[in-house]
């Protein structure tokens, strides 16, 4: 058997053309130029690395330890132990003094006026008012006072005044 004949080969598979010295030099320069741009910027080791690439952020990234103005003790000194002061407790007021304080409380008066005007208070304000009014009731019970006593005194005074008018007018 005979082998089939193949088509003639093109010149591409034949001898390759050799590059001239100038072409080789030019390719080498191009490769060197590309290689130069790899790696870190010159002086980055001494400058701190990121400062070369982000020049605008130097003020924000300053180390706070550099340039500190606080004095540093140079010798060995004994530690000064500060004595812990216990928190002073609020002095206990007498029930009468506490009641007077609550009755003259400006915030409580303002909130009560708003309630009487028909406004609705926030939950915090309403809770605060309720707590203060409850405390006033407790103090009045401790002291033996009540709202009714004041009203009865007023009624008695009015009755006496009416009696005096009648007596004077009747003469």
UniProtKB/Swiss-Prot annotation:
Quaternary assembly: Interacts with Der.
Reported function: A GTPase-activating protein (GAP) that modifies Der/EngA GTPase function. May play a role in ribosome biogenesis.
Designated name of the protein: Der GTPase-activating protein YihI
Keyword rRNA processing: no
Biased composition (Basic residues): 31-40
Source taxonomy: Bacteria, Pseudomonadati, Pseudomonadota, Gammaproteobacteria, Enterobacterales
InterPro entries: YihI
Origin species: Salmonella typhimurium (strain LT2 / SGSC1412 / ATCC 700720)
Region (Disordered): 1-99, 145-171
UniProt family annotation: Belongs to the YihI family.
